[in-house]
């Protein structure tokens, strides 16, 4: 369980995209179970790994279609579990059409928090073993963020979790911190040690 910290433009999002196989490293290589990520079948990667990026989008179509993109066989139980985890279930329950509620292109008309929790639910439906989250609580208020943290604590188990975040509360989910600056890793260590060095209260 790792947090990636750094200022805007430090390279956090780029690193997550490289880990997800969406960008190719110009130097060095990304290894997954000691195998170069470039040698792995992209279909296997997509099945085992989920990335919530800042550029993720909702499209014109029903809630169900948006949530099951890439997982058309997902059951209503799978969908409800993911919605509960992300915190989006109350929003869906308020819609009289439920999962048939129509989403506008880009999620137009939804709040930033609603879009974010729906995109997170889309990722969680597939129950990936490796979870990459880029600022997952950036659009959430403190209450929604606290709910998400508690849900992820219970769900994450033995999965690999890597979070890029500016929000101190999210550090409750990790035991290791990597600090980036201008595309380079400048600190890497146990959470408590890094926070002490940074002068932050331990989470």
PLM regions with names:
Residues 5-7:
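The feature captures the beta-strand-to-loop junction immediately N-terminal to the Walker
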């Amino acid at each position: 369980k790792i947090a990636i910290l750094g200022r805007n433009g430090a390279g956090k999002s780029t690193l997550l995209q490289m880990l997800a196989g969406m960008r190719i490293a110009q130097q060095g290589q990304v290894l997954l179970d000691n195998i170069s990520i470039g040698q792995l079948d992209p279909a296997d990667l997509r099945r085992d790994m989920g990335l919530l990026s800042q550029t993720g989008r909702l499209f014109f179509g029903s809630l169900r279609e948006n949530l099951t993109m890439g997982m058309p066989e997902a059951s209503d139980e799978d969908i409800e579990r993911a919605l509960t985890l992300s915190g989006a279930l109350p929003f869906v329950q308020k819609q009289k059409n439920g999962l048939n509620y129509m989403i506008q292109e880009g999620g137009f008309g939804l709040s930033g928090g609603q879009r974010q929790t729906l995109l997170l639910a889309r990722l969680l439906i597939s129950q990936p073993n490796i979870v990459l989250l880029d600022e997952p609580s950036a659009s959430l208020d403190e209450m929604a963020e606290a709910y998400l943290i508690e849900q992820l604590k219970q769900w994450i188990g033995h999965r690999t979790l890597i979070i890029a975040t500016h929000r101190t509360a999210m550090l409750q989910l990790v035991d290791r911190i990597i600090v980036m600056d201008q595309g380079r890793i400048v600190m890497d260590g146990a959470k408590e040690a890094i926070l002490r060095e940074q002068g932050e209260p331990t989470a």
